[in-house]
Amino acid sequence: LKVLEMIGRTDVPVGKGMVAPMVRATPKDPFSHGADGQAENFLPEPTTPRSPKHAIDLIIDLVKANPGEVTLISTGPMSNIAMAMRKEPEIIPMIKEIIAISGMFGLNKYAFANCTGDTPQSEWNVFVDPEAAKIVYESGVKLTCLGLDVATHFDVNLTDDDIAALDASDKPEAKFLRQAIRFVNNRGFEAYCTSIDC
């Protein structure tokens, strides 16, 4: 809700999702994402009310109302998507596609960076809820994963001109991204890390 309010998209319904992974306890890693989980942007608390529906039910209802038309975008652990599939398996063939920041596949040397605290061979979103990721990966839904292979690669880094354009912009989303870049730079990483860490 904080980010949606920031970009003026309060028309998008948001339900409270799962507070923990499907099976295990939630790991803590405040270093990766900052004290607020958003690169220390510290956005104001939202004033837009959440949907009274749980995120799982919002997913189910949206897919059922629009069969074959909904692309789910997962920027975190896949717990809510997996639970929606478990609760209402009939939605699985109705989902057009899932695009996820998820996993790493060994496609280049950057795929094996130490990006998850003390677990160097794991990507955070899968590390948090591997059981949910397994359900989604094995569901048969068309799945496009942007893993560490893609998101933490110098080829996707921002140029000096890109950063200058962000600095010159008054748009709140540009300021948000610029703070995220400062956050990762202060930790000794390049701007490309914002595509997966923030």
Q: Can you say where each PLM-predicted feature lies in the sequence?
A:
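N-terminal acidic, glycine/proline-rich low-complexity segments
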Residues: 1-198
